[in-house]
């Protein structure tokens, strides 16, 4: 599963 943009924002 490739990380979705939403998940990327959650990391920040």
Swiss-Prot record:
UniProt tissue specificity = Expressed by the skin glands.
Q: Name one GO cellular component term.
A: extracellular region
Keyword annotations: Amidation, Amphibian defense peptide, Neuropeptide, Secreted
Does the UniProt entry include the keyword Secreted? yes
- Methionine amide PTM positions read 12
- Tell me the InterPro entries matching this sequence: Tachy_Neuro_lke_CS, Tachykinin_dom
Which processes are annotated in GO (biological process)? defense response; neuropeptide signaling pathway; tachykinin receptor signaling pathway
> What is the protein's major site of localization?
secreted
**Intracellular or extracellular location(s):** Secreted
Role according to the record: Tachykinins are active peptides which excite neurons, evoke behavioral responses, are potent vasodilators and secretagogues, and contract (directly or indirectly) many smooth muscles.
- Record's family? Belongs to the tachykinin family.
**Protein name (Swiss-Prot/TrEMBL):** Hylambates kassinin
Gene source species: Phlyctimantis maculatus
């Amino acid at each position: 599963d490739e990380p979705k943009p939403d998940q990327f924002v959650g990391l920040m």
